[in-house]
Amino acid sequence: MTGTRTFFVGGNHKMNGSKSMLESLSKGMNESVENKENVDIFIAPSYPYLEFLSNKLDNKKFKVCSQNCYSVAKGAFTGEISANMLVDLGIPYVIIGHSERRNVFSESSELITKKTKYAISLGLTVILCLGELLADRKSNNTEHILSEQLKDFASFTPEEWSKIVIAYEPVWAIGTGAVATPQEAQDTHVFIRKWISEKVSEDVAKKTSIMYGGSVNADNCHNLSKQSDIDGFLVGGASLVASDFIAIIKSAVPKKY
């Protein structure tokens, strides 16, 4: 990692959690994690808890992130939330394009691009998720899939890219206990950075942080974080328990600094 990129550790709670769990999590994090320059730590709780968690976490140390948002400001879109609402709540980050949105809810790359552009236009930082299925990995189709997921972002300006953090999550590793080897993850991150360099600019490629996600825990993040193109972790189940998530933060961050 170069000195120009921020290292991110994020927790995606998905459809999990409760007020009592978040109370315990925020207490543990507030007491046990210190500020570190060039490191951003965020939690993405379920929607009903966004403001609750924001009021509990030390906002000087941590950020709260939404798990999704829609591509317009308001309207007859039952069950959706808008980037405008997140801004109104003071939520600075939003995850867009997670594999569960793509594969379970059939969100297209076109919609994901629209949502990203709109969120960025309101000043939100977008955690843009990419990733391939196991069949794609086995058929050596990973680079093609990632290129297809990225292609519409070639037209984004450097200013827009400055509000994007990539999260590479091989779908076959999410929640399965399987994890890409450090070299596999590094090679894929290098490909993503090369794509950005060729399609957008070399400067944007150097500055864009690329996180890894997929069954990350305190044990495997040691070696993953040593890779030069891995700029953080998007953590799932292990972010639900304070001690587990804190262990990942304390295990990963020192390896970079």
From Swiss-Prot:
It comes from the Eukaryota. GO terms for molecular function: triose-phosphate isomerase activity. CDD domains: TIM (cd00311). It is an enzyme of class 5 (isomerase). Substrate binds at N12, K14. One of its GO terms (cellular component) is cytosol. It catalyses: D-glyceraldehyde 3-phosphate = dihydroxyacetone phosphate. Pathway: Carbohydrate biosynthesis; gluconeogenesis; Carbohydrate degradation; glycolysis; D-glyceraldehyde 3-phosphate from glycerone phosphate: step 1/1. The active site is at H98, E169. Keywords: Gluconeogenesis, Glycolysis, Isomerase. GO terms for biological process: gluconeogenesis; glyceraldehyde-3-phosphate biosynthetic process; glycerol catabolic process; glycolytic process. Its EC number is 5.3.1.1. Pfam families: TIM. Homodimer. Belongs to the triosephosphate isomerase family. PANTHER family: TRIOSEPHOSPHATE ISOMERASE. This is Triosephosphate isomerase. It comes from Dictyostelium discoideum.
